[in-house]
């Protein structure tokens, strides 16, 4: 995705424009309305072209391993079976680049993407995850101590959850986290 920047506070910049007044595509709306309200995925990468290619690659030891997934869904999601991948596709995702600094600090212009997963593919000793962006936002919001708790992120140490390439799942209602952190303008499921 080219020239993608986060909107200003309380603004939504459409990714896809349609003729019927809805700024989101049918596929995006279907994904939104099917999203889990119990879990979300966090994809943190060091790949600089992640938003141009809309995919990220993770080493197997940093892709949904025991350290990165709630115990109750570890077996079924981490196996990357057809059923596991189908379940993963129901979890909303945040995709971002590694923070530019330590201790919860990143460039104020760094963008994170609210997205949904479209494909998961094993490639040797790594996993490639393709995603479809829904909306951008400022990554620094995830780094702020007062908001990090709502996303189940640890920002109180030198190397935080956003400093290391990894694909993880958090037991958090992402839409409640958006509301608590001032990102309530991002699209939500209609139900």
Feature locations, PLM:
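Exposed regions on extracellular, virion, or secretory-pathway luminal proteins
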Residues: 1-13, 82, 102, 121, ...
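Contiguous surface segments at macromolecular interaction interfaces
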Residues: 128-191
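Extended alpha-helical scaffold and adjacent linker segments that couple domains
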Residues: 34-41, 46-50, 55, 122-124, ...
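N-terminal "first-domain core" detector
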Residues: 21-73
